[in-house]
Structure formats: structure tokens, C-alpha cells
Amino acid sequence: MTAAENVCYTLINVPMDSEPPSEISLKNDLEKGDVKSKTEALKKVIIMILNGEKLPGLLMTIIRFVLPLQDHTIKKLLLVFWEIVPKTTPDGRLLHEMILVCDAYRKDLQHPNEFIRGSTLRFLCKLKEAELLEPLMPAIRACLEHRHSYVRRNAVLAIYTIYRNFEHLIPDAPELIHDFLVNEKDASCKRNAFMMLIHADQDRALDYLSTCIDQVQTFGDILQLVIVELIYKVCHANPSERARFIRCIYNLLQSSSPAVKYEAAGTLVTLSSAPTAIKAAAQCYIDLIIKESDNNVKLIVLDRLIELKEHPAHERVLQDLVMDILRVLSTPDLEVRKKTLQLALDLVSSRNVEELVIVLKKEVIKTNNVSEHEDTDKYRQLLVRTLHSCSVRFPDMAANVIPVLMEFLSDSNEAAAADVLEFVREAIQRFDNLRMLIVEKMLEVFHAIKSVKIYRGALWILGEYCSTKEDIQSVMTEVRRSLGEIPIVESEIKKEAGELKPEEEITVGPVQKLVTKMGTYATQSALSSSRPTKKEEERPPLRGFLLDGDFFVAASLATTLTKIALRYVALVQEKKRQNSFVAEAMLLMATILHLGKSSPPKKPITDDDVDRISLCLKVLSECSPLMNDIFNKECRQSLSHMLSAKLEEEKLSQKKESEKRNVTVQPDDPISFMQLTAKNEMNCKEDQFQLSLLAAMGNTQRKEAADPLASKLNKVTQLTGFSDPVYAEAYVHVNQYDIVLDVLVVNQTSDTLQNCTLELATLGDLKLVEKPSPLTLAPHDFANIKANVKVASTENGIIFGNIVYDVSGAASDRNCVVLSDIHIDIMDYIQPATCTDAEFRQMWAEFEWENKVTVNTNIIDLNDYLQHILKSTNMKCLTPEKALSGYCGFMAANLYARSIFGEDALANVSIEKPIQQGPEAPVTGHIRIRAKGQGMALSLGDKINLSQKKTSI
């Protein structure tokens, strides 16, 4: 262990502007000052020793004049002083003065004040000198019988530490602590004693647990947690003990402490794969999610449930708990609800889908009754998508779901209404038996639709699937109702002119008597010349869309009118009725064309919309069989092809996902019989407690051995040259929210380098946690220095700096070696993610930062280039493989990723292969990146620029 890594128990801030006191003045204050002066002097002595000063002349002064004082502040400071002061001579022998200190320790261990006793015992845990501890052992033992629990629990800790470091001083410690544990009543004392037995003498700990296994539920939560840890470790090391302790774990699932329940459930899952055990653990997790108020806890426990689901055998057990899992939806947090719905959808089966749909329908109705909120709208979207997926997987449920969801087509939130419309479109195409019901409900809500986008979709569905005369007539009636009085231009001009006519003045509310200051009545008019503005008038929806200049809906309406008119002609034999219906449809199109080229709309009609409406007029005037087939057959086939491709893509992704799951046991694996297995072979699973401890300490072992390129050596950055007096290289270890730089510093000179300091600075969203300590390097010596850097976002970060040092015996200024810059790889923080096309488009429209990267590569194949970019940026391609397959000379794809900080990154790849330049021509085009923050967009662009120049492998 290097000097920089030595454990430091006490950190004291030193004011930089204060002048260090002299040893003489300190000695004078310690000898002759009052208690306050001695306290201040002792503080200064402690700070100076921490800064490297020796001050050997003050040791005896402190023993003579400060140690006998009974002031509690002095006693606290003395504990710090004795911890840091050198206690041995250079040759390792104990200083003679420490015998006097040892006597003071003994007196403090017998002090009537329990705080002084307890803090002294805690201090003894830090002592590494057996000669100091040996005379104190009787006093430490006596503290086990003190009346106050604070003293007893610290006595246990002291005995445990001394036994671990110097077993010969107290060889009977396990037996002593076992006897203490049997008679002890205080929970914290029992916890410390039991913890010691676990690590010092596990057999005694098990014996004690066996005697009180039925009373475990009555213990305090801190002791219960230690018991869970012991059972896990014992059963992990010796699986034959599982039957002995599994009942205890079952009992601890009923503990009043959430932490104990969580640990017990996790332990139960690792100890047993029996359905009853899995069900009990899952039920415990669900209760924790519902009862805990902290959303982070809910998400962590939900992840444990999702992990359980990944196991095929456990998945069947969890399917019976779907309704219990849905109770979690009572949580208002959107992320928790999202994970819960996804989990429920993964677990739903034909046995419980009906109950699931009932619950989700109730939740949808609830969202309509609560006050509008951004999360409410998003939650409604999640519910709609879940019901959509249920209906596709279980067609029998669609009839129950459709009537409830179609009410939301008139919702003011366009995103939720769009999800409903997408579901209705798929349902009406897939389920022939539901078409009448859907058309009927669509006609009911048609007039109330507020969004033009939803209106267009509803028009398309009605035009495509109205197959009876009555339905077709109903559609025409609804369109006329939604369009209002025609011709539109004339009626609008009349309204404009009517606003200026005095005779059309309208009466306002009841007249009140108004009295002036003079006491006379004021004159009032019962008429008002002001009329409501256009925006205040209640316009029919379609008329409103057209007057606002949105003529794309008019083109959609023209197509719908053409479809239903052609269908009406085929259904009705009477020529007069045929002509009447077709003429009405053509009149509506003509009046819309007239409106588009006149002044009332805010924006004129576009040429594309004019062409579309004119084409529909021409089709209706001719009524050819070819046009009839195109409008009434091929349009529907296009939708059918799209839905089939979508379903196939979903099945393919599900298949890939299932293939990713690691197979626990291969068919040809040998069967392991427990009785025939050597004890050391049973530890097949990793110790979860050890893994969590390593993760907390930042020492998580990554599985890098399988990939040689992912080894630590691949992440070593050279910071200086081989010819520099100090050579340095760094290993950049990236954790989730911080970076650890492990810097190797080598003195390549024949001089001793003093105060060798690594000075670092950061650029970007990085923050240096602490300044590395100075070192002294002998000739040709080396040392490791560690520096922690906090990361707050995925912005590209740079760490730069230098190494400064003094040469021993030289009179020159400090020497400096400038280090190479360390660039932090953004890819360590970006993870592939998925989202729907609608979400992608919405984010693309919302995100304001765009970075356009020009393709500059020597890769000649479009698909190879796309795969190279995906690998380099760690993004996921959202465009289906079928859409990318084949060769046509150009390619467009959407990519998506999320950072661990919750930032979204979108990219659109638009590339082509210039045919005129021959088969060996490189790919050209550009990549557009969008993100909410500038840092993400620029960082991802830089990464693509760096990586695309590499040759495709």
C-alpha cells in the first residue's frame, strides 16, 4: 500500500493565511495556560503533526500538564493526539513515555463517565501496538459488564479488533463474547457480538443461532440483518445447511424492518428455487414496493422482480402474481409505473389477461378524472400501449378495450389520442368481427375530435372500413356537420359583413342602475356593438381546421369522400341516388378548393393539396374500375403489409432477446450430485455480500478476460515521455459516476525527488474530488498515485496537468513535467436504448441542439458503415432490418441511445454510394445528431468524427 492510500481517520482543515506557531510558544501554553489555552495549543499541535512536523519535545509536556486534566474536550483531543503521534523509536521499539500514557488509558477505561469509557474503547480499536494493549486487557474485559450499553458495545468492538490483530492477547475472545451474547439484552450490543462471532468463530455463531432460531422475529432489525448475512454465507459455503436455516429466512420475511425483508427475500431466492420460496420472496418484494415511499427504493426492488422474471422457472410463478404486481400502479411516479406495466405485460397469460384488462381499464378511466398533468398524459399513453399489446396478443380482449379507449380520441393530449388511433387502426384491420363496433364508436366521437392529426386518421379509418349504405350515409352526414354551411366562402363573407351591421347589435346582460357623483342616474345603452371574435365563435371542427390554413386534412377528406362515393355507387343500384351522392361529394371538394384560393383562410392551399383534390374530382367524374380497385383495395393491402412487417419485426426482436439470455445448463452438461461434490466445488455462485462490498468500494471486478482488447492494458494512457526525468502513465478506471486515475510515477534520475506532486485540472463537466498528496521518490523508485474525478454529464471531458518536484540538495526552483491530456471516453456513459417512432419524432422536434457530421470514411459498403457507427457510438438502430436490407445505393436509419444520467441522444444517418464513381467509391452523406444539451450533441459528433475514419473490420 502506498503512502497516498494509507487509511486516514482524521481530516482537519488548516487555514492557509495563518502563521505556524513555534514549538516554544506551544510548550508555554501547554504548561502554564488555562484550560482554553491548552485546548487551542493542543489543536495546533495535532494539525502540525498531521502536516508532517515531529515535535518530539512536546510529548512529555503533554503527558505532564495536559493528560491529568478531566476536561471532556481535552480528553477528546487527546484521543486524536495519541492516534497520530509517533509511538515508537526509529528502530521500532515503544517509547518509554507511552507507559505513562498506557496508565492514563487504564484510568479512562475505569472512568465513571460512560462516554469517556466508550470513546476510549473506540480509540483502542485503532491502536497497532500490542505492548500498549496488553496491560489494558483486564480493564477492557471489565467493560463488558458495565451498566451502560454504549460502553458494552464498544467493548465488544475493541475485543474483536484486538483478537483479529493480536490473538495472543485474548485467545478466549470467541468464548467470552458467546457468553456475553447469551446474557445480553441490548440490540446493538447483541449485533456487535454476533458480528464478531460470524467473523471470528462461525461455529459458535451458528450454535447461538440454533438455540434462538424461533425467537429471531423478536430481535431488533440490526441483529436480524446480521443473521441474514450469516445464513447466506453458511449456506453459500455449505449448501447442505440450507434445510436447517431456510425456515428462519421465511420467518424474517415477516420482519417489521423493510431492510431485513429485502435482504431475506434476496437470500431466499439464492438458497431455494422451489416455487413456494420464489412466490414468498416475490410477494415480499411487491409489499415493499407498495409500502415504501422512496421512489428509488421502489425502482431497485422492481429491478429485483424483473431479474426473477428472467429465469424461466421463476417466470411461471410470477405469472400468478400479476394482479398483485399491478397494485404498484397506485404509485404516482411515472418511471415506477412504466416498469410495472412492462413487467405485467411480460408476465400476462391467457389465465389472467381478463383481470389485467379490467384493472387497466379502471386506471385509464381514473386518468380522465384527475386534474391534467404532464405525467397523467404520459401515464395514459403507457396504459393505452399496454392495452394495445394485450389486445394484439389476446384478440378476445379487444372488444372489451375498444369502447373505453375510443373515448380518448377527443382528448386534448394529441400523443395519447394518437396512440389510441394507432391501436384502433390495427384492431379494425386484424379483427373483422369488431369492424362494425369500431365504426359505430368512431362516428359517435368524430365530431368531438380536437386535433387535426387525429381527425385525418379518423377520416381514413371511416373511409376505409364503412361498408354498408347506412354507414356511408352516416359518414357523409358527419362530414357535412363538421364542415358547416356551404359554400364556405360566401357564408364566411356574409359573417364578416354581418359584423359591421348596426341592426345586428346584440343585447348584453341585465341593466344595472348606475348613480353619478352628483346623485343623478347615468345613461346606459341596452345594446352592445361588440360581437365575439372569430376565435370565440363555435366553429365546426373541420371548418376551423380549413380556415386556419390546414388544407392537408382537406386532401385526406377528398380521398375519404372518393372511397365512400365509389363504394356507394357499387352498393346502390338506383342511378339517381348514385349521382346525387357523387355530386354531393364533388360539391364538398369544389367548395374546399374555392376556399383555399380565397381570402378567409389564414394560409392559402398548397399546390400538392390542390393536385390531390383535383385528382379525386377527376376520379369521381369518370368512375373507372381501375381507380375503384386502387382506392378501395390496394390502400388496405398497404396497411396489411405494414402491420405484418411490424409483427414480424417484433417477433424477431423477441427471439433475439430470448437468445441473449444465458442458458443456465446445457443439455450435455454433467449432472452434479451434492453428496459426490467436493466442498470447494460448491461455491459455484459468487458471494453477493462480497460483490456488493466491492461495488461500494469501487473495486468491482469486470469480466474482461474473455475479450483481450477490453483488458486494463488497453486503457493505459502514457502521460510523459521515456526521456523525461519523471515517467508517468495512468490507468483510467471508469465507474458509473466517477473516474479513478491510477497514475504510475517513476523517478528515472539518480536524485531523490522531494515533494513530488501530481497537479491535475479538468475541462468540461468534470470535478477533481481531492488533491493528491505529495510524495518523496528515491532514485529510480516508483509509486502509484490515485485521483478521483466526479462526472456529472456525458460532455467530453479532458484531464490535464503536470508533475512538480524538488531535487534533494539542489538550490534551483521547482521542476515541472507537463503531462499529456487524458480524454474521457463518452462511450463509457452511453447505453443503447429503444423508443417508438412517435417518441423519436417528438424528441427530434423538441431537441434544440443539432450537430451535423459529414461522412468522411474509406468504408465502401453502406451496411458496413452503419454497423461501424453503431459499434463506435454504442447506439441502437431503430429502423427495422427489413427496411435496411437489399441494395439501392442509399440508406437512411434512425439511431437512439440514453446516457446513465438520463440524457437522450438521437441520430439520423443519411448515406449513399455514388454510383458514378465506381464500386470502390467510399460512402458519402451526413449524420445529424440531436440532443437536449449542447454537450451531448457535440461529444457524440466528435466521437463519430474520430471513429468513422477507421477502416471497417
Swiss-Prot record:
Ordered alphabetically, the record's keywords are: Acetylation, Cell membrane, Cytoplasm, Cytoplasmic vesicle, ER-Golgi transport, Golgi apparatus, Membrane, Protein transport, Repeat, Transport
Its tissue distribution reads:
High expression in the lung, kidney, skeletal muscle and small intestine, and lower level of expression in heart, liver, spleen, stomach and fat.
**Has UniProt tagged this entry with the keyword Repeat?**
yes
Which residues are recorded with the post-translational modification N6-acetyllysine? K494
Molecular function GO terms recorded: structural molecule activity
GO biological process terms, alphabetically, are: endoplasmic reticulum to Golgi vesicle-mediated transport; intra-Golgi vesicle-mediated transport; intracellular protein transport
**Where would one find the signal peptide in this protein?**
none
Q: Tell me where in or outside the cell this protein is found.
A: Cytoplasm; Golgi apparatus membrane; Cytoplasmic vesicle, COPI-coated vesicle membrane; Cell membrane
Modified sites of kind N-acetylthreonine: T2
* Membrane topology term: Peripheral membrane protein
Q: Does the keyword Amino-acid biosynthesis apply?
A: no
The ranges of the HEAT repeats are 96-131, 132-168, 240-276, 277-314, 316-353, 396-433
| Cellular component terms (Gene Ontology) | COPI vesicle coat; endoplasmic reticulum-Golgi intermediate compartment; Golgi membrane; plasma membrane
Name any one Pfam family assigned in the record. Answer: Coatomer_b_Cpla
- Disulfide bond residue pairs: none
The protein's role, per its UniProt record: The coatomer is a cytosolic protein complex that binds to dilysine motifs and reversibly associates with Golgi non-clathrin-coated vesicles, which further mediate biosynthetic protein transport from the ER, via the Golgi up to the trans Golgi network. Coatomer complex is required for budding from Golgi membranes, and is essential for the retrograde Golgi-to-ER transport of dilysine-tagged proteins.
Q: What else is known?
A: Brefeldin A induces dissociation from the Golgi of the beta-COP and presumably the other coatomer subunits.
Outline the subunit composition: Oligomeric complex that consists of at least the alpha, beta, beta', gamma, delta, epsilon and zeta subunits. Interacts with CAPN8 and PRKCE. Interacts with SCYL1. Interacts with COPG1. Interacts with ARF1 (myristoylated); this interaction is required for binding of COPB1 to Golgi membranes. Interacts (via trunk domain) with ARF1 (via switch I region); the interaction is direct. Interacts with KCNK2 (via N-terminus); this interaction increases the channel-mediated whole cell currents and promotes plasma membrane expression of KCNK2. Interacts with STX17. Interacts with TMEM115.
Protein's name according to its UniProt entry: Coatomer subunit beta
Biological source species: Sus scrofa
